[in-house]
């Protein structure tokens, strides 16, 4: 962050953490700081976890398979959820230009990563979701990926959502400001 903000370039670590809302003035982690950086934010906020499962067809014996709960800081959850999705997403076979048969997920992984990242970063962190234990739910069905993220779309109109023009509204501005400076192994 020192490289991107001349205002913070000369600040010490404590001041930077406070001024970027990672910590409070007394040094305690904020909710955004906890979710983004703590080793196990689910200890004090269990709803910050996410679950994923492959939903079986109605005629199959059982409801789901490969149920997994994801925890840890937001960047690690993103990486773990993406790896799980890559393992469980159905694939299609196609012949490449070189004549070799290849398998590709039914949804491009770059798109999946963006969807998961948006669900994690833009989820509602208010008392009516966290306090009620609402967490992110990801489900793979035979023909689609469904991600339910607590809360709603705040700051965007239906017209903006339906438009091809880019519209942006950070639901959790402090969290977004923190995680935009973080990196995962895949970027």
Q: Whereabouts are the PLM-identified features?
A:
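Active-site helix-to-loop segments that bind/position phosphate- or nucleotide-bearing substrates
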Residues: 1-130, 136-145, 149-169, 182-187
């Amino acid at each position: 962050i020192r490289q991107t903000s001349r205002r913070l370039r000369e600040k010490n670590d404590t001041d930077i953490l406070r001024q970027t809302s990672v910590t409070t003035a007394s040094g305690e982690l904020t909710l955004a700081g906890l979710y983004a950086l703590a080793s196990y934010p689910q200890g004090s906020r269990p709803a910050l976890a996410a679950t994923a499962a492959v939903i079986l067809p109605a005629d199959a014996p059982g409801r789901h398979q490969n149920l997994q709960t994801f925890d840890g800081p937001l960047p690690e959850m993103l990486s773990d959820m993406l790896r799980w999705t890559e393992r469980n997403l159905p694939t299609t076979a196609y012949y490449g230009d070189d004549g070799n048969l290849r398998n590709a997920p039914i949804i491009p992984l770059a798109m999946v990563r963006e969807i998961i990242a948006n669900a994690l970063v833009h989820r509602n962190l208010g008392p009516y979701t966290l306090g009620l234990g609402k967490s992110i739910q990801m489900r793979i069905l035979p023909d689609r990926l469904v991600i339910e993220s607590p809360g709603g779309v705040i700051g965007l109109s239906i017209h903006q959502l339906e438009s091809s023009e880019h519209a942006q509204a950070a639901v959790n501005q402090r969290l977004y400001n923190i995680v935009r400076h973080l990196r995962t192994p895949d970027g």
